[in-house]
Amino acid sequence: MSEESLIEEKEKKLEDIRKEAEEKACLVQRALYYVEEFLAGPMCGRCYPCSLGTYEARIRLIRISQHLENVNDSDIKALKRIGSKMIEGSFCKKGKDTGKFIIETLTSSEEEINQHLSGICPKKECINLIEYVINPELCIMCGKCLEVCKYDAIIGEKREPYLSGYLPFEIRQKRCTRCGECVKVCPTEAIEVITTKKEELVSSK
């Protein structure tokens, strides 16, 4: 790849990043994608409010998306403060627009953000907060999920004519990467995405 091609690849337009980010249903994943793509391309790093703010925003968003220890409302307040500082202090429009995007995303649904602070991703896109499980009532034991899984996360035996006593299909959570390939090939939609933390338990606190 030529040097010219590398420069073109790096200089991704902010408009394209925004468009791709907005394809994500989860607000946290939307903001995280935008920030990571901005860091990887358009950010020049010439002013501190933008460069340091974007790195800090990424750390805070990862904390929220993974529901790391002690994550709380202070992370949201920090992100809003970072966004404001980027709008005020960034030298270029790119930094200011990134700050605006962070604030707009976080304030578009406080309920969804608060659910993340409780360990729940309502859109089921934060992979650390979800699990893939096989519904035995819908599973026809065709074995397609087993064949497509690259991580040996699925165990079970494919149904064969005139035989009985099968090992039911199951997803081993420690091996599962939540890539979603098994969901795509399942003909009966037997693979369900669930939150690892029950919403009713959170709301009752």
Describe every region a protein language model picked out.
Residues 44, 142-145:
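Cysteine-cluster motifs in flexible loop/terminal segments that predominantly coordinate metals
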Residues 49-59, 97, 144-164, 181-199:
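Iron-sulfur cluster-binding cysteine motifs and their immediate structural context
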Residues 33-41, 81-84, 119-141, 155-178, ...:
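Ferredoxin-like iron-sulfur electron-transfer modules
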Residues 1-131:
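Redox cofactor-anchoring modules in respiratory/redox and cofactor-processing assemblies
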